[in-house]
Every structure is written in structure tokens, then in C-alpha cells.
């Protein structure tokens, strides 16, 4: 029996086309592409602006059930479906997020898909790529430096150093940096204060880049960032420190979407990368809108399960950008359904139809939740070699009772040939006119009511708790004019609840909001629940331990 090739071996053997040829497939002239080597390029702002009058294609969201720690192949399915749509004669473009170094060297691995459904160059995409994350990190930390510098040189804005909300960021999992005291070492180093680091993908600058429509909108949003409060409790904005212009300069090139290709030489935009458990979890509005102008179908993903990524895609990205999705694909795996049914991770390779049927309650809730937004749904069963016929049949039967269809997909092993049936079904749904998209809640509700609606309708929580300080802060923001903003929930991805160990479809649990943060530039309020951290830590045995350069200088271990 031949050995199974690793993702990196498959990617390295890809017959890539020069990036200018991929651009030509979309009608992008050579002079409107800024190449980064031979296989990736940025699309110019000038070209993007010139497409404004063109009709939009169909927008397809790929989301998932609550995942196992290894992920369920949502990006793989997004890439596979894009290839599948092109295979059946549709002009399809894929839009996914860039990879963060944190999970790449931590536990989850890369973000370029897997098997024979990948975007390439895989190694570049998973590491430094075109430098967007570096630019975002630099812009964020420039503002942090200017805050402390302003205070050092006299504090003209009367910033209360006890109420500075702007932390620093880096693109790495490093729990040691969550809480720290800066400016130690004497008068020459400034005024000591407590602070800390978040991971870059949790940065408001990342969210702003992904929600901004052009450079002018980007600079306006950067200026709207609230870095902290004065002694009279009025907010201090980034523009008060004259930081917004320099930040926009650092982000000028990063605003341009990155064009790459799949293993089957189909176009893909890989741009932006906010996490879905601690941020809004979607690729950039610029990339999505550009793709909609250039393709008949755009396949995009939202991070983690539909309770996080899809809800934020609908309630934040679509609401803010005026997007109207035409269909949604929910990715499910037999192993994740069994885990939601109580099977331990080490036993997931053993057939257990009873546990799987129990775990299907998780899938059923995600189907119902997506339908709440008026979007038609199909379920993609991402096939693993350990799946049995009985288990697959049980999933299909369960989904059919919901009035939907579950389709077995083998794109990981077979590429576009393994996902044709799903591609045809997606076209059927998107062309049916069934989609009647609407957000979950209205703008005029109070911020706490919005949190309660998400918790009750999507998570099926029985109660939302928050101490007086949290409620008072929300009320204060409403009085300052921020009450119409949507809410971005920061929650574990492993459960509908705030307890990562509470699998399946729990009812009546309590959602405890322990902290709220105002992202005035991005245009949402973050509600942090449970034990979720905006700076993750590495696991006991991180992926980094297995990544190295071989004798030929090639990377090994990067999935």
C-alpha cells in the first residue's frame, strides 16, 4: 500500500502557474499586479476601484460544527468547493484568511487547506507570506509606542495611565506576555504601568484592515480607535495623538488583497486573518467584494463553528459591508460528531453509531442557527479514512430529517473530483432564490440585549451574567453614541457554552461576560466570556517541536 503524502509534500509537487496567468483568468492586467516572487501577488487599489460598477456574483459561506482540537477541514472544504465549482464550469474564486504563526507553531497547524485541496505556495502562506501580519503588528505597536511617548513628554492629553486600553501585540502564542509591567528601570524609561500583549489576530488593527473598504476608510477607522481615557473619563482617540496617518502608511500595501492559486490553478484571495473565537473571524471585505466583481461564485469561510464564525460573518461582516450570502455549507466530520456524542479523542477511529447519533444534535443546532439568518444550508461530510458506511448513513439520515441534504465529500483525497456533487448542490441552492438574508438582531437594541440575543438564540443559554462594572461600561458606551454597534462574542470554539468540555447541544447554561472592550475603529463591541484568552499559550508539545529544515534545505513538519 503506497504511503499517504503529507500536505507539504503534495503542495511542493504542485504544477503552479505564474501568478500573472492566474490574474489573467480574472481579467487583471499585469501592470495591476504587484508580484511577490512568481506565485503570489497583490492586486492594486486602482484596479479594485475600477470594478465598482460590475454586477456581483453569488456569495457562498463555508462554516462548520464545533470542532475537535485538530479542526474539521473547513478551509480544505472551502478550497475544494472552489475547485469543484470551477470543475463544473462555474467561474469561482476562493476567499480565505491568512495564517497566524501562533497556531502554526502551536496545535492547529497551517491555514492553507489540506491534501489535494490546498492553496499554494503553502509554506509561504503559512509563514511570512506578503508581510501583511508584520505590517499590522507594526502599525498596532507604533500606536502603543506613541501612547507611552506622549505621556513621557508631558501628557498634554491628560491620559489616565490607569485607564489605557491599548495593549501591544505579536504574532505568536506566548502566555508569559499576557500581563506585564512596562517602563521599569528608572525615570529615563517613562512611567511604569501595567499592560500586556495580545496575539496579532486579536488586534483591532487586524479587524479594521478586514472591514475597511479603501485607504480613506482605513485611515478614518484607525483615527477612531480609542486608546484609553483622560482623567475626566472622556475617550482619547488615535487621531488625538496624530498616529492615524503613520499607521495608515504602514498598512497601505497590506490593504491590497493577495492573489494566489489552488493546486488545480484556480484563483484564490488570501487576505486578513482575525480569529473567530477572539475576533470576528472573516477574511477582508476588500478581498470578498473584489472577488464578487470578478467571479460568478465566491466561496469564503468563517472561522471555527457556526456559533462563532458564521454568526459574526452575518452580524458583523455582512451587516457592515452590505453583503448578502446566497447559500451556506456546514462542514461536519464523523469524528467531531462522535466527540460531541461523548467519545474520547483516542477512540474516535472506532465505529460508534450510537455516539454519533447523539452528537448529531450539535450539527442540528448549527443547521437551525444558519437558517435563522435566512440562508439555505447544505451539509458537507468531510471524509476521513476511519469513517464507516454505517456512520456516514446515520449522518445523512439525520440531516434529511431536518429538510436538508448531507453530501459525502472526498476532496482531501481526490481534489475537485471528490466534491462535484456538493458543487452542483451549492449552485442549485444559490440559484434557487431561497436566500432571504437578515441579521439576528437590530441596531437599536441595547448592547446587553444584543449579547443576550446571541446567547439565547445561538448558544441556547438560559442566562447571561455580568457584574455591575461590565453593565455600567456598556451603558457608558451607549451614552457616548456607540449603542448601535454590533457585538463580537469572544468564546471558546469547542462548545455552544463557555465551557470547552460541554459538548453536544447544551441547553440552559450560563454565559458569563467577564470583560467588554470597545473597538470603535472596527465598529463593534467585544464581549469576553469564560476563560477565553486574547493571547493564547503553546500546548505541552507544540507543533514547533516537529518543524525543521532537512538536508536539502526544505521545510519539514509544516503539515
From Swiss-Prot:
Which pathway does it take part in? One-carbon metabolism; tetrahydrofolate interconversion
Molecular function terms from GO: ATP binding; formate-tetrahydrofolate ligase activity
Binding-site list for ATP: 68-75
Query: What does the record give as EC number?
Result: 6.3.4.3
Pfam families referenced in this protein's UniProt entry, alphabetically: FTHFS
What top-tier enzyme class does this entry carry?
A: ligase
Q: Which InterPro entries match?
A: Formate_THF_ligase, Formate_THF_ligase_CS, P-loop_NTPase
**Swiss-Prot/TrEMBL GO biological process terms:** tetrahydrofolate interconversion
Q: Give the catalytic activity.
A: (6S)-5,6,7,8-tetrahydrofolate + formate + ATP = (6R)-10-formyltetrahydrofolate + ADP + phosphate
Keyword set, alphabetical order: ATP-binding, Ligase, Nucleotide-binding, One-carbon metabolism
Extract the HAMAP family matched here: FTHFS
Q: Which family does it belong to?
A: Belongs to the formate--tetrahydrofolate ligase family.
What protein name applies here?
Formate--tetrahydrofolate ligase
Q: Which organism's genome codes for this protein?
A: Rhizobium etli (strain CIAT 652)
Amino acid at each position: 500500500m503506497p504511503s499517504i503524502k503529507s500536505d507539504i509534500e503534495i503542495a511542493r509537487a504542485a504544477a503552479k502557474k505564474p501568478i500573472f496567468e492566474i490574474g489573467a483568468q480574472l481579467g487583471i492586467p499585469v501592470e495591476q499586479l504587484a508580484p511577490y516572487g512568481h506565485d503570489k501577488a497583490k492586486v492594486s487599489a486602482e484596479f479594485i476601484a475600477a470594478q465598482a460598477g460590475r454586477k456581483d456574483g453569488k456569495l457562498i459561506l463555508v462554516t462548520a460544527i464545533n470542532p475537535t482540537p485538530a479542526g474539521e477541514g473547513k478551509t480544505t472544504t472551502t478550497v475544494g468547493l472552489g475547485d469543484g465549482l470551477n470543475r463544473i464550469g462555474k467561474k469561482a474564486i476562493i476567499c480565505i484568511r491568512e495564517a497566524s504563526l501562533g497556531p502554526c507553531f502551536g496545535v492547529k497547524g497551517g491555514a492553507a487547506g489540506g491534501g489535494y485541496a490546498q492553496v499554494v505556495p503553502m509554506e509561504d502562506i503559512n509563514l511570512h507570506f506578503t508581510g501583511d501580519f508584520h505590517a499590522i503588528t507594526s502599525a498596532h505597536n507604533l500606536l502603543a509606542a506613541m501612547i507611552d511617548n506622549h505621556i513621557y513628554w508631558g501628557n498634554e492629553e491628560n491620559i489616565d495611565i490607569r485607564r489605557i486600553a491599548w495593549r501591544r501585540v505579536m504574532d505568536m502564542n506566548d502566555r508569559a506576555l499576557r500581563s506585564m509591567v512596562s517602563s521599569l528601570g528608572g525615570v529615563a524609561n517613562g512611567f511604569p504601568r501595567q499592560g500586556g500583549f495580545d496575539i496579532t489576530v486579536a488586534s483591532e488593527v487586524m479587524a479594521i484592515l478586514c472591514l475597511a473598504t479603501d485607504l480613506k476608510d482605513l485611515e478614518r477607522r484607525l483615527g477612531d480607535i480609542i486608546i484609553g481615557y483622560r482623567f475626566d473619563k472622556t475617550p482619547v482617540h488615535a487621531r488625538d495623538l496624530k498616529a492615524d496617518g503613520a499607521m495608515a502608511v504602514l498598512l497601505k500595501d497590506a490593504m491590497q488583497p493577495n492573489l494566489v492559486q489552488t493546486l488545480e490553478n484556480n484563483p484564490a484571495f488570501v487576505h486578513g486573518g482575525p480569529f473567530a473565537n477572539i475576533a470576528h473571524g472573516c477574511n477582508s471585505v476588500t478581498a470578498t467584494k473584489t472577488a464578487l466583481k470578478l467571479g460568478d461564485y465566491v466561496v469564503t469561510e468563517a472561522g471555527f463553528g457556526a456559533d462563532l464564525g458564521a454568526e459574526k460573518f452575518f452580524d458583523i461582516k455582512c451587516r457592515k459591508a452590505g453583503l448578502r450570502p446566497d447559500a451556506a455549507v456546514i462542514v461536519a466530520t464523523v469524528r467531531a460528531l462522535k466527540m460531541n456524542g461523548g467519545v474520547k479523542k483516542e477512540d474516535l477511529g472506532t465505529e460508534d453509531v450510537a455516539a454519533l447519533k447523539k452528537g448529531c444534535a450539535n450539527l442540528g443546532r448549527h443547521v437551525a442557527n444558519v437558517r435563522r439568518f435566512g440562508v439555505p444550508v447544505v451539509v458537507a461530510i468531510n471524509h476521513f479514512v476511519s469513517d464507516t458506511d454505517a456512520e456516514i448513513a446515520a449522518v445523512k439520515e439525520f440531516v434529511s430529517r431536518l429538510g436538508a441534504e448531507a453530501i459525502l465529500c472526498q476532496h482531501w483525497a481526490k481534489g475537485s473530483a471528490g466534491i462535484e456533487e456538493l458543487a452542483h448542490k451549492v449552485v442549485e441552492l444559490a440559484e434557487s432564490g431561497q436566500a432571504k438574508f437578515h441579521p439576528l438582531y437590530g441596531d437599536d437594541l441595547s448592547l446587553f440585549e444584543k449579547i443576550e440575543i446571541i446567547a439565547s438564540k445561538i448558544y441556547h443559554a438560559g442566562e447571561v451574567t455580568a457584574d455591575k462594572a461590565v453593565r455600567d461600561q456598556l451603558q457608558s458606551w451607549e451614552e457616548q453614541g456607540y449603542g448601535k454597534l454590533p457585538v463580537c462574542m469572544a468564546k471558546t470554539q469547542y462548545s455552544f457554552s463557555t465551557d470547552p468540555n460541554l459538548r453536544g447541544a447544551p441547553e440552559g447554561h450560563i454565559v458569563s461576560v467577564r470583560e467588554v472592550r470597545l473597538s470603535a475603529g472596527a465598529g463593534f463591541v467585544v464581549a469576553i466570556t469564560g476563560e477565553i484568552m486574547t493571547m493564547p499559550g503553546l500546548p505541552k508539545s507544540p507543533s514547533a517541536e516537529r518543524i525543521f529544515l532537512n538536508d536539502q534545505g526544505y521545510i519539514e513538519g509544516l503539515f
